[in-house]
Amino acid sequence: MSDIALTVSMLALVAVLGLWIGNWRIYGVGLGIGGVLFGGIIVGHVAHQYQIQLNDDMLHVIQEFGLILFVYTIGIQVGPGFFSSLRVSGLRLNAFALLTVFLGSVVTVMLHKLLNIPLPIILGIFSGAVTNTPSLGAGQQILTDLGSSTALVNQMGTGYAMAYPLGICGILLVMWLMRVLFRVAVDNEAKQFETSNGQHHEQLLTINVSVTNTNLQGLAIQDVPILNRDTIVCSRLKRGDELMVPSPHTLIQLGDYLHLVGAKNDLEQARLVIGNEVETSLSTRGTDLHVERVVVTNEKVLGRKIRELNLKQNYDVVISRLNRAGVELVASNQASLQFGDILNLVGRKTAIDAVADIVGNAQQKLQQVQMLPVFIGIGLGVLLGSVPLMVPGFPVALRLGLAGGPLVVALVLGRIGSIGKLHWFMPPSANLALRELGIVLFLSVVGLKSGGDFVDTLLNGDGVWWIGYGALITIVPLLAVGILARTLGKMNYLTLCGMLAGSMTDPPALAFANGLHPTSGAAALSYATVYPLAMFLRIMSPQLLAVLFLTL
């Protein structure tokens, strides 16, 4: 059998075994995608026993490409809401991530000083315990630059391999302990995130208001400040028995009924100004008005603001809501359209059909994946990750690496949405498929590489102690920060899990957190919020520790 056929066959075996292990449930909790790592360790051990040799270069390429696929699709998924998340809660989330990194470094220093663990070993255990491969590379590089022998530098890799599996299990254990300790109901946490935080947007509501304020008599809608905001849309007006779609120039009369869409606080302010909330129906049923949802797929309208389309003036149609990446937004005049946006239209049937033709409404396009933008994004991400970042006082340049670079680029491209005919929108099913494929490839190779020496070091060497040290470095900071964030910070459980996974730059942990509630984006959003800073700190920390240990 050729090297390629053998390697692919082994990876397939690892994936099948690992996914099967991941489906096991103990008290309702399983390893999920993390089971692939243990499938890899088992197959790697058997391959080592029977002296089955796999191509290391090929495995390395598959491992890195799998990681790139995973982080890129995560970035595309959370990109539309990432920057608003950063403004709203980014400081708090990154502060907790910083605390996690700091506490892990403190535990590492204590173990090194109290137990006299050799420097390469403790740095390797530290990198494995926090499941950060770039940290391992940075530590090995600085040890080499500081004059350590090749044998000592290689010991760091051994320590990493011993600590890595329990590093992944440790964070999953902490997530499970947090769930048990605080009696978390995951479905309730997801609902709380969607309603209270509204994906960092307030949930949109509707009310019907009767105009009783005499000061509004004869004023155009655009002349009423509360109705001229970007936070409220007046999508219907009923006068007598006539239901109409109002324009900014429509004159208000006493006794008119207005159908308003907006956030709770904005609607309450509008009610206080306009009049009284009423139960009178402003339904389009039985009238010549219709409400339909159409999707934006026409390249000609991408990037254009809603006001530029002049839908009300030209077609007597109002956009009452805009759904972007699952988030309901007020369709303000300043909002720019992106590929995949879903518009809630109110108007006459023929007019809505005309507007649908303008914005595209080609449902089949949403199921198509443009591969050109995918590889453009990956290529740009790899280039960004390879750019050296020189920090004064450090003997080596820092880099975002093959994980950080594609993530940052994907976040930016996901936020932009489209450039010309290139759309970075990806159907959820396609995004999930690529993401799962990436993480399975990555974990399969990590497991295969660790499996060869894992059992021997565990049974005949100091492996058990190394695993124990790694467990302390993994669990103590995560548990401390998790309890602090939940009790004092009142952090949503799914957001907390994503933040913990991001602070460890741990894709398998994120996959596990996403699996807790597959339809909620809370974990992925908080992961992406803290990941860039956490990756930078994880790369810096072993270098700082090496300098610290050698100078004290």
UniProtKB/Swiss-Prot annotation:
Any single GO CC term annotated in Swiss-Prot or TrEMBL for this entry: plasma membrane
UniProt topology in membrane: Multi-pass membrane protein
Family: Belongs to the AAE transporter (TC 2.A.81) family. YidE subfamily.
GO biological process: potassium ion transport
Classification via SUPFAM superfamilies: TrkA C-terminal domain-like
PANTHER family from the UniProt entry: K(+)_H(+) ANTIPORTER SUBUNIT KHTT, TRANSPORT PROTEIN YIDE-RELATED
InterPro entries: AAE_transporter (IPR050144), RCK_C (IPR006037), RCK_C_sf (IPR036721), Transpt_YidE_put (IPR023018), YidE_YbjL (IPR006512)
Protein name: Putative transport protein ECA4401
Positions of transmembrane segments: 4-24, 26-46, 65-85, 90-112, 158-178, 371-391, 393-413, 439-459, 464-484, 493-513, 530-550
Subcellular location: Cell membrane
Domain spans labelled RCK C-terminal: 191-276, 279-361
A molecular function (GO) term: monoatomic cation transmembrane transporter activity
Keywords, alphabetical: Cell membrane, Membrane, Repeat, Transmembrane, Transmembrane helix, Transport
Pfam family, one: TrkA_C
Keyword presence, Repeat: yes
Primary location recorded for the protein, binned into one broad class: membrane
